[in-house]
Amino acid sequence: MPTVNQLIRKPRITPIKRNKVPALQSNPQKRGVCTRVYTTTPKKPNSALRKVAKVRLTNGFEVIGYIPGEGHNLQEHSVVMIRGGRVKDLPGVRYHIIRGLLDTQGVKNRKQRRSKYGAKRPK
């Protein structure tokens, strides 16, 4: 434990809080246009073809968003809504594309966690 004298000489520094989703600019979601839709491979222990899209947001930022769920209808010039939330095994992917909103369709034949994938209640 430091003495009072030591604290006067070198005060305690509070850690800097860095923003994990700077492109949202303190908004819950942001709209954007897909500039490129493609697949990437995840980091070392995992193996897959993850669907991602490069999105130009309304505030001018260009970000990479993950497309969750099985199958999607996105292509270049699709208008999408983006939310925060990174994908742990994809470096540089800090955002998620919201399913069932604007040009993004919901996931077909989804029975559980439907609200997360924009799927309507089955009859």
Curated annotation (Swiss-Prot):
GO terms for molecular function: rRNA binding; structural constituent of ribosome; tRNA binding. The modification 3-methylthioaspartic acid is found at residue 89. The keyword Ribonucleoprotein applies. One of its GO terms (biological process) is translation. The keyword Lipoprotein does not apply. GO terms for cellular component: small ribosomal subunit. It comes from the Bacteria. It holds the Pfam family Ribosom_S12_S23. Keywords: Antibiotic resistance, Methylation, Ribonucleoprotein, Ribosomal protein, RNA-binding, rRNA-binding, tRNA-binding. SUPFAM superfamilies: Nucleic acid-binding proteins (SSF50249). The streptomycin sensitive allele is dominant to the resistant allele in B.henselae. HAMAP family: Ribosomal_uS12_B. PANTHER family: 30S RIBOSOMAL PROTEIN S12 FAMILY MEMBER. Part of the 30S ribosomal subunit. Contacts proteins S8 and S17. May interact with IF1 in the 30S initiation complex. With S4 and S5 plays an important role in translational accuracy. Interacts with and stabilizes bases of the 16S rRNA that are involved in tRNA selection in the A site and with the mRNA backbone. Located at the interface of the 30S and 50S subunits, it traverses the body of the 30S subunit contacting proteins on the other side and probably holding the rRNA structure together. The combined cluster of proteins S8, S12 and S17 appears to hold together the shoulder and platform of the 30S subunit. Belongs to the universal ribosomal protein uS12 family. This is Small ribosomal subunit protein uS12. It comes from Bartonella henselae (strain ATCC 49882 / DSM 28221 / CCUG 30454 / Houston 1) (Rochalimaea henselae). The gene is rpsL.
